[in-house]
C-alpha cells in the first residue's frame, strides 16, 4: 500500500499551475519505485484537473529526488543561494510543462 510507504501532495498555485509538494518515501521503502510512482501519479492528477504547468521547490543535493523529477520531465529553471534550518543551501525551482 503506497500510503504506508510514502506521500506526496499536489497544491493549487493558480488556475493553470500546480505545485508538487512534500514528496516523502519511508527509508525502508526507498529503491522500490514508490517515489517514481508517487511523482507520476501526482503529474497525472495535475493533468486531470487541467493544470498546464507544474512547479516544485527543493534544494541541491537531494540526488535521488532529482532523478525522479528529471525522469518525469521536470527541468531545473532556477537556482539561488539560501539559508534555512540553520544551514546554507542552494535552492532550486523545477518546472514541467503539461
Regions found by a protein language model. Give the residues of each.
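Conserved amphipathic alpha-helical interaction elements at protein-protein interfaces in regulatory
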Residues: 31, 44-48, 75
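Active-site acidic-Proline motif in GNAT/NAT acetyltransferases
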Residues: 26-28, 32, 60-61
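Acetyl-CoA-dependent GNAT
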Residues: 1-27, 39-41, 45, 78-82, ...
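Residues forming the Rossmann-fold NAD(P)(H) cofactor-binding site
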Residues: 32, 36, 40
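C-terminal "cap" of GNAT-fold acetyltransferases
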Residues: 52-98
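Conserved GNAT acetyl-CoA-binding A-motif
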Residues: 39, 45-58
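Short coil/turn segments at alpha/beta junctions that flank glycine-rich nucleotide-binding fingerprints
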Residues: 16, 32, 48-52
